[in-house]
């Protein structure tokens, strides 16, 4: 069985661990400390809102198609039978694509080492001119990534990649009928569908040339006679140790593959904008005729992408309502704890399996064939309950401070008719007490800092996010593409400047969030994040009150361009100061390349 992120003994939905580099943070941070703006700034509110309305982006077009898709809706009584062809048929061979003669090992080592040194830097999308020459360019994955490189809006790129991930299942149908409700199986009959995303040769390369450690980056586990064993030796996961454990029947689970694999990073960085929630992943390599993990359920929405080999999966519905859409992962279950599976199937390369939080699952390799799959995970602790858990204490605090009814004393004799021992009492005083509680609870909604808590959750998402992946266009039109360099003993091509005539928009849609803290405004952003989870402290810029409406206009008008001279500021100096600061940080792009002065 393969354990998804944050299962029992598994890593939580994080991209990895590392020592943090601290950055000075704004003081007085509080979700109740909303920004204070001078009256002179508020006169721009109406004009800013009208500009946003005029610049509103067109809605995305959705496509419909026939699909070879199975869900478990309506299959509660008996498990889906394992197809006869899946029991006996040998896997169809995946065509081997010859490597270019130029793709020698030293070049590959040099390229990946350079990527490792720049984990937090934006990178171009696959399909651009700097992509790995060893990747199979004609695979469906590489074709869609090349297509994304030509889509100007990051929103549309995220929607397109998710559409490709589910294809031929329409995303709108998936969200309306299946998301958080049913397990879904998509069969594609195309072993090359995910080719270029991740492979066993990629894992072998990482063991040889990257600093991979047992327990931190790689787990070795097996499930024998109803017991799971984790067999992580201390220290670095060198090939000799890792492959010896694999030969001994251990599954290898690579945590945070996006920290090592540029393609996995790029895949997740695009999809995180679709979910509005952190997207993580693990990779699982299981030897033939073995099972790595015990049956369990997880606290994330799981998308299983079968990359190599074959694997038998059994998926079970939550056993009772308390396990439905679980907020925490389960302990390991025994086979006696399980009922009949609602879905039993063999995944082959190119297939996709989705199941919600709380669905128990286990998987094993059979027929002498290994299995490699990637689990994409999202929506960990991203529920209404989690949101209200943050809102209600703050609402209570505000209500006590602002409404005298919450400060009035309890009845002197309330213990005579309240409490468990009086729960069956018909005392009218008890009825009046309960009514008073209901009235006060209903009033709490007036004090709920909903927007402030939403901003704090958005700030957390910005910190959780992977750094953005840039298209060729985004790189060429932003500071990342300026031709400034050192040449002949001095820097050259220095001097490009924004003017009031320059047209700009944000680099991407989900890369920044404006948050009020301690009476000040801060713009939190992702472009300097690491591919390793929280390796860096949150990054932010202070936005002055006279620039607040202009900043909001830039955030809300994406992907439409705004002329710098039209930003709602009090002066040209404020307009240019804000635009230049954002451009220099890599947060803005221009409609045309800047002209060197």
Curated annotation (Swiss-Prot):
The modification Phosphoserine is found at residues 62, 65, 86. GO terms for biological process: negative regulation of DNA-templated transcription; negative regulation of osteoblast differentiation. Its EC number is 1.14.11.27, 1.14.11.79. InterPro entries: JmjC_dom, NO66-like, RIOX1/NO66-like_C_WH. Keywords: Acetylation, Chromatin regulator, Dioxygenase, Iron, Metal-binding, Nucleus, Oxidoreductase, Phosphoprotein, Repressor, Transcription, Transcription regulation. Its main location: nucleus. GO terms for cellular component: nucleolus; nucleoplasm; nucleus. It catalyses: N(6),N(6)-dimethyl-L-lysyl(36)-[histone H3] + 2 2-oxoglutarate + 2 O2 = L-lysyl(36)-[histone H3] + 2 formaldehyde + 2 succinate + 2 CO2; N(6)-methyl-L-lysyl-[protein] + 2-oxoglutarate + O2 = L-lysyl-[protein] + formaldehyde + succinate + CO2; L-histidyl-[protein] + 2-oxoglutarate + O2 = (3S)-3-hydroxy-L-histidyl-[protein] + succinate + CO2. Binds 1 Fe(2+) ion per subunit. Transmembrane segments: none annotated. Its cofactor is Fe(2+). Residues 250-395 form the JmjC domain. Belongs to the ROX family. NO66 subfamily. Interacts with SP7/OSX; the interaction is direct. Interacts with MYC. Interacts with PHF19; leading to its recruitment to H3K36me3 sites. This is Ribosomal oxygenase 1. The gene is Riox1.
